Regions:
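Conserved P-loop NTP-binding catalytic core
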Residues: 37-42, 48, 52, 61-113, ...
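Long, charged, glycine-rich C-terminal linkers/tails
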Residues: 83-86, 236-248
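Short polybasic amphipathic segments
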Residues: 5, 101-103, 123-130, 246-256
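Pre-Walker A-like glycine/lysine-rich segment at the N-terminus of P-loop NTPase domains
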Residues: 2-66
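Electropositive, glycine-dotted interaction segments
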Residues: 113-241
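N-terminal accessory segments
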Residues: 1-7, 12, 228-237, 255
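Conserved ABC ATPase signature
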Residues: 46-50, 244-281
Length: 281
């Protein structure tokens, strides 16, 4: 669950900017949108971002995608390193400084604070801390500067042997998520970050969001999805996915007046239906 997302010197955001999902104490109107972990703070399940034209809404969406994509691709040996491809600092400066991201998430009774600082050449800094939600105690998982990685006691024995193998352009989180380790901390944080979803108002034009999340929903929660589609009167009787041709395709089933079944490509459904499915995800 997302608690905070911070970015600095990315796209149009020169100064540190924070998206905070902590609910204010006076928030009483929609208690079903609150998550209560038994702590002093409660957290929003969903937040909507409004603003004037050119105020940064689309760039916030892009920044989240860059943050996630660097984590996904920083170990891949492509033609262009991920940090170079997604290093897009504030433009109106003669000398570009490092870009920075940080996220706080809660999973399995722990709050994790993870972030990294980077430029087009290397990872300048990276860190991961874990706070026990029951005791309030915070411990270091790892801290990285441009030349060294220091591990906390909980992972040091298992991870120390790999520290010299981590390339300067690769994130520690990405590196250890790829390995089969006894500790689950890297996989837990990686999964929570990948589950963070920022939906733009023109989301119907972005098939990547559906292709990434909808197959798992169809496989694991199809019954709930169909109940939801019935409740909003979408007219959809079934939904399926197929990637046999190396391209994810979604098909919806409708019942005609003649009681025959008719099949429709999901992207031929109305914008409202597609947006509703994305909100369900």
């Amino acid at each position: 669950m997302l608690v905070q997302f911070m970015l600095k010197n990315v796209l149009s955001f020169k100064e540190e900017t924070v998206l905070d999902m902590t609910a204010v104490q006076a928030y009483k109107e929609h208690e079903s949108n609150l998550i209560d972990y038994g702590t002093k703070e409660k957290f929003l399940r969903v937040a909507a971002i409004y603003g004037a034209n050119a105020s940064g809404k689309s760039n916030l969406y892009l920044a989240v995608r860059y943050f996630q994509q660097i984590i996904i691709d920083s170990l891949n040996s492509g033609m262009v390193p991920a940090i170079k491809e997604y290093y897009i600092p504030f433009s109106f400066e003669e000398h570009h400084e490092n870009s920075e991201f940080e996220i706080s998430v809660i999973t399995e009774d722990f709050e994790y604070r993870y972030g990294y600082e980077y430029n087009a050449e290397y990872i300048a800094a990276e860190w991961l801390y874990r706070k026990n939600m029951n005791t309030g105690r915070t411990s270091t998982i790892f801290e990285r500067t441009s030349g060294t990685v220091e591990f906390g006691a909980s992972v040091r024995k298992e991870c120390e042997v790999y520290k010299e193998q981590i390339p300067s352009e690769t994130l520690v989180l990405t590196f250890f998520n790829k390995l089969k380790l006894e500790t689950t901390v890297f996989r837990s944080v990686y999964s929570e970050i990948m589950n963070m979803l920022v939906v733009p108002t023109d989301l119907c034009e972005d098939r990547g969001i559906l292709e990434r999340f909808l197959p798992d929903v169809i496989d694991l929660e199809k019954g709930k999805l169909m109940e939801f589609l019935t409740a909003i009167d979408a007219g959809i009787k079934d939904i399926s996915c197929d990637d046999r041709d190396k391209r994810m395709e979604f098909t919806t089933t409708h019942m005609g007046k003649d009681k025959n079944r008719y099949f429709l490509d999901l992207y031929s459904e109305s914008e409202g239906t597609i947006k509703s499915i994305l909100l369900f995800i």
